[in-house]
Amino acid sequence: MTRLIFLGPPGAGKGTQAQILAEHLHIPHISTGDILRQAMKEQTPLGIKAQSYVDSGELVPDQLVQDLVEERLEQADAKSGWILDGFPRKVTQAAFLEELLQKTGQGGERVVNLDAADDVVVARLLSRGRKDDTEEVIRRRLEIYRSDTAPLIDYYSDRQKLLTINGDQSQEEVTHELKATLGS
């Protein structure tokens, strides 16, 4: 049973690789951004709460994101495995997830760190041509990633769950290395 958590800086290719691998393994690619948007669109109780934060320009609180992730991992299609993308972002969320997976008998997860150099990530994100992706904004997002999310690398490394993949490679090379490393 495959349970993977994808980490890496913005522009490292997490979403792309998670989707490719999820299709290859026939398991759901669970993106926290997607489940948040879906819950708001469907006006679920959690979605209504989240919408109030989004409408007021605030970050959705950790507890609400954790509740959404828990709800999603309890769905039938996630019982045979999953790939999480965009969660956890902090060590406190990782501890929550670890406890949740133990409680639900879904342990054995592995963590894929798509490690990409800042200059590579900046070039990739600038090439997307989004007007809000200026070099200054991208470098700020990288700073936030390094300070908030990077401690997860140590957290999972200490638990011998971390696989690091060179995210500087082409999409095809990363996919090949991922499949080879995971034996899929």
From Swiss-Prot:
The ranges of region (NMP) come to: 31-60
The record's PROSITE patterns line, in alphabetical order, gives:
ADENYLATE_KINASE
Compartments reported by the entry: Cytoplasm
State the GO CC annotations: cytoplasm
Q: Give the organism's phylogenetic lineage.
A: Bacteria, Bacillati, Cyanobacteriota, Cyanophyceae, Nostocales
Comment field on protein domains: Consists of three domains, a large central CORE domain and two small peripheral domains, NMPbind and LID, which undergo movements during catalysis. The LID domain closes over the site of phosphoryl transfer upon ATP binding. Assembling and dissambling the active center during each catalytic cycle provides an effective means to prevent ATP hydrolysis.
For this UniProt entry, what is the primary localization, expressed as one broad class? Answer: cytoplasm
Q: Does the keyword Nucleotide-binding apply?
A: yes
Name of the top EC class for this enzyme: transferase
**EC identifiers of the protein:** 2.7.4.3
Q: Which organism is it from?
A: Nostoc sp. (strain PCC 7120 / SAG 25.82 / UTEX 2576)
Q: Which domain of life is it from?
A: Bacteria
UniProt entry keywords in alphabetical sequence? ATP-binding, Cytoplasm, Kinase, Nucleotide biosynthesis, Nucleotide-binding, Transferase
One GO term of the biological process aspect: AMP salvage
**Which gene is the coding source of this polypeptide chain?**
adk1
Provide the residue positions that the database annotates as binding AMP.
T32, R37, E58, L59, V60, G86, F87, P88, R89, Q93, R130, R141
Q: Does the keyword Cytoplasm apply?
A: yes
Name the segments for region: LID. Answer: 127-133
Q: Which GO terms describe its molecular function?
A: adenylate kinase activity; ATP binding
- Sites where the protein binds ATP: G11, A12, G13, K14, G15, T16, R128, Q169
Family matches, as CDD domains? ADK
Report the protein's function.
Answer: Catalyzes the reversible transfer of the terminal phosphate group between ATP and AMP. Plays an important role in cellular energy homeostasis and in adenine nucleotide metabolism.
- Designated name of the protein: Adenylate kinase 1
The entry's family comment says: Belongs to the adenylate kinase family.
